[in-house]
Amino acid sequence: MTTCWNHNTAYHPWILSAVAERPRARVLDVGCGDGLLLEKLTPYAGELVGLEPDTETARRASDRLAGLPHARVLTESFTDHIPEQPYDVIVFVASLHHMDLAPTLIKTRDLLSPDGELIVVGLSANRRLGDWLVSALQVVPARVLSLLHGETRDTGMTVAPPRESLAEIRATARALLPGAHIRRGLYYRYLLRWR
């Protein structure tokens, strides 16, 4: 398995442990990039579906997953995705901020099985003084850990700046996903889980 480390892959162990709690789960990775997370999830999931709207990136993910019969990549957006059946787990890693938040959370909620789970490693915009202070306090630890892990800075993925602040994300999630757990993470990320 070809692997790399960056501020997103740093949270792969957290995602793997959550999926491992649901043996043989049907998992959707939205904005799956080059398929690294899907590849790591193969021992834990019964079926893996990756969505990647960028044609070249989707090809790279499909190449990575070639020979894994229970994993596939679809070159389409989440908005256009119509699954055959609900998912047990839906994952967004640094992809939710590329989409309109409320409609995406509503669709996610609708695509989950009755006991399904949403897992997000997301980015939020700095809007308030507190946001900027937290980000400033993370600079040194994030840089030191990036050096220690040998961060791969450019993995060829599509990037976009976050649109909503963490307060806005919390308010939207509170309204649409009652009981969602949201917390700040390291590396300028937030973590969301909802069942």
Please provide the spans of the model-predicted regions.
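Conserved alpha-helix/loop element of class I SAM-dependent methyltransferases that forms part
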Residues: 6-25
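Conserved beta-strand/loop positions that form the S-adenosyl-L-methionine
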Residues: 30
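Class I SAM-dependent methyltransferase SAM/SAH-binding core
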Residues: 34-36, 40-79
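Short conserved loop adjoining the S-adenosyl-L-methionine
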Residues: 80-84
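A conserved beta-strand element that flanks and buttresses the S-adenosyl-L-methionine
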Residues: 91
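A short, conserved alpha-helix within the catalytic core of class I
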Residues: 99-108
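Conserved beta-strand signature within the Rossmann-like core of class I S-adenosyl-L-methionine
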Residues: 115-122
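C-terminal alpha-helical "lid/dimerization" subdomain adjacent to the S-adenosyl-L-methionine
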Residues: 124-172
